[in-house]
């Protein structure tokens, strides 16, 4: 692309979702400043009729076809059809399959979508991340029952970032804020105390964190949220709830999120 006005349409054809091809094309496009490229994904292409339609559309639009087709018959048909129609193509996965075959003498399975069917961990991770968002900050007490781990503590004890971090370890985490004026959900006392983790913090550390939070929001640091007496009241209340739940407690005063998450993960595995 020699100037900013040239426009290119790229049809991304795949016998699966098409995410792999799209990511590769996006990575390539990012190398061209001022480029005008439109990506159009066409997933789950498994028949020659669809390929013929795409090739003709691409011919009229003077477009490029980038594809990931693992079935040789379908891949060859696309290449032949595109060549006959003078449509440019990029085979993203074919050369890699051929090279691996040459170097290992192993034969591909030629099954579309295997990366998604085999990668169960990927889906568990996505499910856990969605769970953490849905049951963040005590917004739905049903999450307490469904969760692998429940985090409880006062505001600014890293409950949300911990929930997200642990979700990437495929753990479903709900978190519940403890506030003196709000009765904790009854579900908290129905679950095993072993799957509940209390987070405590020193008053001074929490005061510092909340003061910085208020500054970031453009609010006065004298607000009750960062008042040391109020903080002590909240922490005392939280301790009573944790004692009542009889759950293990982690002091997060001087711990990074990663360190605390690893501790929680280890405790969960032991249980």
Swiss-Prot record:
Function per UniProt: Bifunctional serine/threonine kinase and phosphorylase involved in the regulation of the pyruvate, phosphate dikinase (PPDK) by catalyzing its phosphorylation/dephosphorylation.
Q: Name one Pfam family in it.
A: Kinase-PPPase
Recorded catalytic reaction(s): these are: N(tele)-phospho-L-histidyl/L-threonyl-[pyruvate, phosphate dikinase] + ADP = N(tele)-phospho-L-histidyl/O-phospho-L-threonyl-[pyruvate, phosphate dikinase] + AMP + H(+); N(tele)-phospho-L-histidyl/O-phospho-L-threonyl-[pyruvate, phosphate dikinase] + phosphate + H(+) = N(tele)-phospho-L-histidyl/L-threonyl-[pyruvate, phosphate dikinase] + diphosphate
**Where would one find the signal peptide in this protein?**
none
Which top-rank group of organisms is this from? Bacteria
| PANTHER family in the record | PYRUVATE, PHOSPHATE DIKINASE REGULATORY PROTEIN 1, CHLOROPLASTIC (PTHR31756:SF3)
> InterPro entries given for it?
Kinase-pyrophosphorylase, PPDK_reg
Similarity comment: family membership: Belongs to the pyruvate, phosphate/water dikinase regulatory protein family. PDRP subfamily.
For this protein, the record's HAMAP family field holds: PDRP (MF_00921)
E.C. numbers: 2.7.11.32, 2.7.4.27
Which terms are listed as keywords in the entry? Kinase, Nucleotide-binding, Serine/threonine-protein kinase, Transferase
Residues annotated as binding ADP: 153-160
GO MF entry, a single one: protein serine/threonine kinase activity
Name under which the protein is recorded: Putative pyruvate, phosphate dikinase regulatory protein
Disulfide-bond pairs as recorded: none
